[in-house]
Amino acid sequence: MKKIRKKELYREGEPRITPREMRDKGVKYVLDKIKRQPGYYVTNTERDLSQSDFKNRIMPHTQLLVAEERNQAGFFSLEITGGASVHVDMLRKQINPLEKLQVLGERMPDTMFQTLCRGINLFGYRPYPDNVIRMTVRTFARYVHVWRVFDFLNHIPNMVPVFEEVKAAGCILEPSICFSTGPEHTDAYYVRKVGEILDVTGEDILLCIKNHGGLGTSKRIGDLVRAIHDRYPDLVIHYHGHNTDGEDIGRIVAAVLNGAKIVDASDHAFTGFYGPPPLLSVVDILADYGYQAAGLDRQAVIETSNKLRPER
């Protein structure tokens, strides 16, 4: 495969955040930069879109096709691995998920890669031994910069081994609270869970509100972001949702208006029914509220979808 020349797009003082910046200046510097930046950042959740709407059928060929445009786009991160994608890479596509990350990383040197990890279930469907968890995290941490970690019951001890290894690797740790709408899922419940996470991790983390069910109203999400922000004002909140009910753009807007600094969306040419909402719709609506996407190159986002559309 022909190697393309790496092109460093980052310049000192720009709002975008690069892997080099994280390596050279550390996680705390990155978190402080996010807090100082007006507006909000966008994560492109291609992995979740691929899993939710295409059964992880998006191939490395397609990812390489738009690598240059995505690298130019200025996303906070690109979720490109994790969840069910690792086993699909190995068992169905018959590719090495680590080699995929290495090749894509060479073509996207200015973009942080993100993964979704299921705590002690890692990228699988059952609990794994402690040594397997730690070895796996160390191995993937060579290529992955942002680690979103969750336990679907919000049982914090199930995430601790991953927390420890991500921190030790110098990567950005993003513990999650999984959102639901039962009578017990109050603001007080979630604020308490955030406290349990911080007791383990300290405050040098991102916190994800993980609304993978696409539940709740925009007001409900806004109230939750505000409750967490009021209790922990220095915490950087990252909202993740699905557009299954068609309402997630409203929830994203409410999250940003109430203090979230990073939100998830996907390339508009690939969005469908169950994944995150279309990126440009999110950006345009928030712009009408006076919030700009930090570091985002709109033309690169458009060119990405122009290339992706025939691949759908």
Where are these regions (language model features)?
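Catalytic cores and adjacent flexible loops of soluble metabolic enzymes
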Residues: 1-148, 152-312
